[in-house]
UniProtKB/Swiss-Prot annotation:
It holds the Pfam family MCR_beta. It comes from Methanothermobacter thermautotrophicus (strain ATCC 29096 / DSM 1053 / JCM 10044 / NBRC 100330 / Delta H) (Methanobacterium thermoautotrophicum). This is Methyl-coenzyme M reductase I subunit beta. Gene3D superfamilies: 3.30.70.470, Methyl-coenzyme M reductase, alpha/beta subunit, C-terminal. Component of the methyl-coenzyme M reductase (MCR) I that catalyzes the reductive cleavage of methyl-coenzyme M (CoM-S-CH3 or 2-(methylthio)ethanesulfonate) using coenzyme B (CoB or 7-mercaptoheptanoylthreonine phosphate) as reductant which results in the production of methane and the mixed heterodisulfide of CoB and CoM (CoM-S-S-CoB). This is the final step in methanogenesis.
Length: 443
């Protein structure tokens, strides 16, 4: 039996209806098979840069910047022997021959997509098994393939896994995961939020609605892990996931379509308020001179509508600029305006607006330490909104036309080449909506 009475209509990224009257819980990370698969896949998947390993050994440049050990060069044809190396690595990574291990070569043997078997995570406290098991297997496979001596084996390890354990992170490694190392988490349950915006944008090949969907899945699934989406707050997070990230009832798409040509953040707000009135989410509570104060009997649904409006406003504003840099201002002033317009709380009850103040400072202003694309939901500046800010940043970076110094191409090239090959990472909206439609009658 369903916990909640809410039902939504689900659409694809072109605004076409896929399924009507889907129970809200069919989009829950606890119930939706595609979301479960995406989350498990992100934990299990590792990108291996075989060409990078070969070049690192050839030049003896290992362990990060300014590390060249002259006299320790190794000229190994790793790319040319990629098939043999990958087969040997897979044999070490797998638990049984018929498990869900995957080692797939890409780009003519220059890259490898590795998915560590689920069985390894059944006996793991967290997700470090993916990069560490993969790295160790490829190190041994390369050593065995080329009969590397015991005196040169450490160079192979350094070329694959970098400076670790002398460094906390895998500095200079030629492997990549979307999840960052556990030591960088701001607190318990933050792992799925600790994924750079640019990684999400790269994996979805800069498709705006898909990037927003993947970011929302990660952020809102983290809320279940953190204990935020429990009890009285579960419905609020599910509605946010549905409307802001999954384009429920085509709300985001409709707002962008209506405002895309000549609209502004303000016109999106006007349309959003009108839609909320039509749908009975809000009502006029008090009429003053030339001003209406609105009220609602369903704050969680109002928050979902406001969050969808915020996503649409981001797409309209950053899309018009073809630049992501202004996304912090959109996050801030959309909420400022909607609070004045309605008398109701902004998205996430003020937490997005508050996040945007610090985000503006740290991506612009006196400090200006990095562009929007290098932030994540675990970052000390942007962690405060519980799942409603970072998806808009992902949408903004997907719309950016190359204005950023820290672009997805610059920070996330290996992620793009490898992770985008996984259909569910590249088109999460499609697979989550289809899965929700399949299980709707089971809820």
């Amino acid at each position: 039996m369903a916990k909640f009475e809410d039902k939504v209509d689900l659409y694809d990224d072109r605004g076409n209806l896929v399924e009507e009257q889907v129970p809200l819980e069919a989009l829950s990370p606890l119930r939706n098979p595609a979301i479960k698969s995406i989350v498990q896949g992100i934990k299990r998947t590792v990108a291996v840069n075989l060409e990078g390993i070969e070049n690192a050994l050839k030049t003896a440049k290992v362990g990060g910047p300014a590390c060249k050990i002259m006299g320790r060069e190794l000229d190994l044809d790793i790319v040319g022997n990629a098939e043999s190396i990958a087969a040997a690595a897979k044999e070490m990574i797998q638990v049984t021959e018929d498990d869900d291990t995957k080692v797939e070569l890409l780009g003519g043997g220059k890259r490898a997509l590795v998915q560590v078997p689920s069985a390894r995570f059944d006996v793991a406290a967290e997700y470090s098994a993916a990069p560490l098991v993969t790295a160790t297997a490829f190190v041994q496979a390369i050593i065995n393939e080329f009969d590397v001596s015991m005196y040169d084996a450490n160079m192979v390890k350094a070329a694959v896994l970098g400076r670790y354990p002398q460094s906390v992170e895998y500095m200079g490694a030629n492997i990549a995961t979307m999840l960052d190392i556990p030591q960088k988490l701001e607190g318990p349950g933050y792992a799925l939020r600790n994924i750079m915006v640019n990684h999400v944008v790269a994996a979805t090949l800069k498709n705006t609605l898909q990037a927003a969907a993947l970011s929302t899945i990660l952020e809102q699934t983290a809320m279940f892990e953190m204990g935020d989406a429990v009890g009285a707050f579960e419905r609020m997070h599910l509605l946010g996931l549905a409307y802001q990230g999954m384009n429920a009832d085509n709300l985001v798409f409709d707002l962008v379509k209506a405002n895309g040509k000549e609209g502004t953040v303000g016109s999106v707000i006007a349309d959003l308020v009108e839609r909320a009135l039509e749908d009975g989410v809000i009502k006029v509570e008090k009429e003053l001179t030339d001003y209406k104060v609105y009220g609602t009997d369903d704050l969680a649904m109002w928050n979902a509508y406001a969050a969808a409006g915020l996503m649409a406003a981001t797409m309209v504003n950053q899309g018009a600029a073809r630049a992501a840099q202004g996304v912090s201002s959109t996050l801030l002033y959309y909420n400022d305006l909607i609070e004045f317009e309605t008398g109701l709380p902004g998205v996430d009850f003020g937490k997005v607006e508050g996040t945007a103040v610090g985000f503006s400072f740290f991506s612009h202003s006196i400090y200006g330490g990095g562009g929007p694309g290098i932030f994540n939901g675990n970052h000390i500046v942007t962690r405060h909104s519980k799942g409603f800010a970072i998806p808009c940043v992902a949408a903004a970076m997907a719309l950016d036309a190359g204005t950023q110094m820290f672009s997805p191409e610059a920070t996330s090239g290996l992620i793009k080449e490898v992770f985008s090959q996984v259909d569910e990472f590249r088109e999460p909206l499609k697979y989550v909506v289809e899965a929700a439609a399949e299980i709707k009658n089971e809820i």
